[in-house]
Regions:
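Short beta->alpha junction loops
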Residues: 86-96, 179, 203-213
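An alpha-beta-alpha
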Residues: 159-205
C-alpha cells in the first residue's frame, strides 16, 4: 500500500476500507509504532491547541487557583476536548513582557486564543484584534471595540447588587475591591448610579484579589469600618466571603448590622 494509505489508516480515516485499515493498525501496534501528532499537525499547518491566557496586569499577585479561574478553566477544557483540541494555559505578567500577546499568537503553538479578563491590557488586545481573528476575550464590552468579547453585563449587575442592598435597608454603601480593571469599574459605575438615585453615599474600600493581600486589606477595612456603613458590595464572591469572615470575627451581625453582596460571572 502507499504511504498515503498508511497515513490515512493510522488516522482512522473512513477513506480506507475497514479490513485494510484494521490490518495496518494491527501491524503498527505489533511494531510499537505510535502516530506522531506533532508531525501530522505540522503537515496540516495546525497545532490542535487553543491557548488560554490570563493577563494579571492589574494585580500580579492574583492566583490561577482562584475558584473563579478553576471553574472557568474546567469548562473550557471540557468543551475543547469535545472538539478535539488541547488547552495550553499561560499566566501573563505584562510588566515583565509588554509584547506578550504578539509573541504568543506569533509563536505558531496555538490555533486560536482565549483571553480571560482584559485586566489593564485593553489597548494591547485592541491592537492585535485587527489582524488576528481567532481570538475571543472573556471580559467587559465597550462601545466601538474591535475584539470579540463574551461576558456578563457588569454595569447592570452592579446596579442589581446595589438595588438589593438598598431594598434590604442599607443607607450607606461601600464597594469592596479595585475599581481600575474594566469589569470592576463597570460594576462600581452601576452601583454608583443606584446610589445616586436612592440618595445614599457610596465609598470605595480598595482591595486586591491575591489571597494574602486581600485578607490583610479586608481585615483592616473591617477593623476601621465607618459605623455608618451598613451595605457592602464586594467586587467578587471571594472578597465577599473574606469580608463576611472578618465581620464575624468582630461579632458584627450580618445582615443585621451590615449587609453584604458579592459578584461573580
Amino acid at each position: 500500500v502507499s504511504p498515503g494509505t498508511v497515513s490515512r489508516a493510522l488516522a482512522g480515516k473512513s477513506l480506507v476500507n475497514a479490513k485494510t485499515r484494521d490490518r495496518i493498525q494491527q501491524l503498527a501496534r505489533s511494531h510499537g509504532f505510535q502516530l506522531n501528532r506533532l508531525a501530522s499537525n505540522l503537515r496540516r499547518q495546525r497545532t490542535g491547541v487553543i491557548g488560554v491566557a490570563i493577563p494579571l496586569g492589574h494585580d500580579r499577585g492574583q492566583q490561577i487557583s482562584d475558584s473563579f479561574f478553576m471553574t472557568l478553566l474546567g469548562y473550557l477544557a471540557d468543551a475543547l476536548t469535545e472538539h478535539g483540541y488541547d488547552l495550553m494555559l499561560r499566566r501573563v505578567l505584562p510588566d515583565q513582557d509588554e509584547d506578550w500577546l504578539h509573541r504568543y499568537i506569533g509563536s505558531g503553538m496555538v490555533d486560536g486564543l482565549l483571553v480571560i479578563g482584559q485586566s489593564d491590557q485593553f489597548e494591547r488586545i485592541e491592537t492585535v484584534a485587527g489582524s488576528y481573528l481567532p481570538m475571543v476575550v472573556w471580559g467587559n464590552h465597550q462601545e466601538g471595540q474591535r475584539h470579540c468579547v463574551v461576558g456578563t453585563d457588569n454595569r447592570l449587575g452592579g446596579k442589581f447588587a446595589a438595588e438589593r442592598l438598598v431594598e434590604a435597608g442599607a443607607r450607606n454603601l461601600a464597594f469592596l475591591g479595585d475599581i481600575e480593571p474594566i469589569e470592576f469599574a463597570a460594576r462600581f459605575a452601576g452601583a454608583c448610579e443606584v446610589a445616586g438615585q436612592a440618595g445614599v453615599p457610596i465609598c470605595v474600600l480598595s482591595a486586591h484579589l491575591s489571597r494574602e493581600r486581600a485578607l490583610a486589606e479586608v481585615t483592616h477595612h473591617v477593623n476601621t469600618l465607618d459605623p455608618a456603613i451598613d451595605g457592602i458590595f464586594a467586587a467578587t464572591d471571594t472578597l465577599a466571603v473574606t469580608c463576611l469572615n472578618a465581620l464575624s470575627a468582630r461579632r458584627t451581625a450580618v445582615p443585621g448590622q451590615v449587609r453584604i453582596i458579592g459578584f461573580d460571572d
